[in-house]
Amino acid sequence: MTLFILTETSAGYALLKAKDKKLLKRDDLEKETQTAEGVSNLLKLKNFQKFDSATTALEEVASLVEGKVTPRLASLLESIKDEKKVSLAVADPKLGNAIGKLPGLSIQAIADSTTADLYRAIRAHLPTLIPGLLPTDMSTMALGLSHSLARHKLKFSPDKIDTMIVQAIALLDDLDKELNTYAMRVKEWYGWHFPEMAKILNDNMAYAKVVLKMGMRSNSDSADLSEILPEEIEGAVKAAANRSMGTDISNEDLENIQCLAEQVVGFAEYRQQLASYLTARMTAIAPNLTALVGELVGARLIAHAGSLVNLSKSPASTIQILGAEKALFRALKTKHDTPKYGLIYHASLIGQATGKNKGKMARVLAAKAAIGLRVDALAEWEKDADGNEPTEEERAALGMESRYYLEKKLAAMEGKPLKPRGVGIAPNGIPIEQPKKWDIKEARKHNPDADGLTGDEPAATENVSKKSKKDKKLVEEIKDEEMKDAPESEEEEEASEAEESEEEKPKKSKKKESKTSKGKDSDEAKIEELAEKAGLSVKRYLRKLERGEINFDEDGNPTAISKKELKKAKKEAKKAEKDAGKKRKRDEDEEPAESKSEKKKKKKSKA
């Protein structure tokens, strides 16, 4: 089988033919290819197709990087079409697969580790294999092609589109800070002239527009604010302007305030435009991530990771705590619990969870987001039969399904329905209330009639709600009547149940049991009498009798031992035990001493 070697250079395509068909199987291939003579003895040039210009060289190399066969390369391969049993050595496996799929060419592409040494030798001694090619020309052409290829990659790389998201979210955060600072400065500055307007208007944008439209507060009657404010608030602003307590300002002061107000209005309008641009970018680049966590949280995750591809390579555990690196390393250093969430904490699904469920939802949401990110970054969408590209809904189908699953899981964990999408959720799980509509309320007046009241007499202008609460009918509490015939103890209840169940027994057994029941009744009567004498209930009397806390006189009258007497008896018993223990120790200490003296006497007697 004839062996050909395809070599891609910065000057053009070179097709080399091996003089030995079993060149790749030789053991001494590395030794023979160390010199230019050895390489020229093993290989010879079959065909060389030169690039016409630098632009064509860039197009050819860019397509080769993607593993595509260009028409120029296909025409070069047609020169070996007539030869039988051809094998072609290729440096890139992707390119080898593409060449093997070409119609009309029965070429076996080889792209494995056996060709690495051969290609290394060809690159080192390429000028000797291609006549008319100088080493200096090769280096200059390679340098120019590498620069143009780098520019091409930076310009048209799909991975770099997410840089727009990174810059947009960073600018959005900066705009929020600047807008808040400028709006507060306008309120403080214009507040010297018209301080009441800051309490009426909560919206910074509306405040700045009113400053631009009205100017001095003396122009409030002639100024038309209907385009900016509703009728009620417009009337309140004009009424407050007529009775304002602010100081007068000069025209020069007003011009500077209005210039700052123009900046606030311009920044606010641009911020809205930037937010809509960011939403459109996120739905186009990462639709599944946007469906799961929202465009703002998704954009912050991408910006923190650096790019969409870097974020898609991260596992779910990293996505979960992304943005909480300081807390993580602090916890690892101090051997405390690691954080459960980072930037993902601001997602609406986690915001609606409460307590321990926040950590669970963060873990599940990060797992689903990791899957959606890999689809967004690495999936290749093909056109349908009609040639139409997939819609945004089709691309975001996985994210929508995952969100539906997470919403069901969260509702099951929380045991309550979720808030609709679009509702702002605070970190504590409560929806963020929008600023309420400003209403004019009458000031509370002093009630002179209430000054002369004495005691708990109500005021003349008391609220109706308070009266209604006081006028509620009281519910009478009926005390439970004590049943005279009811059994006082569990024993009596059992006896009564036994009597009811045993009515069906024969008469003889009834007579016997009636005697025993009479005996029991007489004993219970005696116990009740003794309990009354002791001044205790029957239950307490029985308990104390079991503990031995009741003494009987000579006449048989019981007396309960008090708590003080019990404490004294216990203390005396403890002292007696301690004294007995000390005596035992003394006896034990004396016994060995006596045994020693006896041993000494025995020794003396033996001697």
Swiss-Prot record:
Where does the protein end up?
Answer: Nucleus, Nucleolus
Q: Basic and acidic residues: which segments have biased composition?
A: 473-487, 514-532
Functional summary from the UniProt entry: Required for pre-18S rRNA processing. May bind microtubules.
Q: Which protein, by its recorded name, is this?
A: Nucleolar protein 58
Q: Where is the composition biased (Acidic residues)?
A: 488-503
Specify where the region named Disordered lies, as residue ranges.
419-438, 446-607
**InterPro entries, alphabetically?**
Nop56/Nop58, NOP58/56_N, Nop_C, Nop_dom, Nop_dom_sf, NOSIC
UniProt source species: Coccidioides immitis (strain RS) (Valley fever fungus)
For this chain, the annotated S-S bridges are none
- Tell me, in one coarse class, where this protein mainly resides: nucleus
List the keywords (alphabetical): Nucleus, Ribonucleoprotein, Ribosome biogenesis, rRNA processing
Name the domain of life: Eukaryota
Q: Which gene encodes it?
A: NOP58
Offer a single GO CC term for the protein.
nucleolus
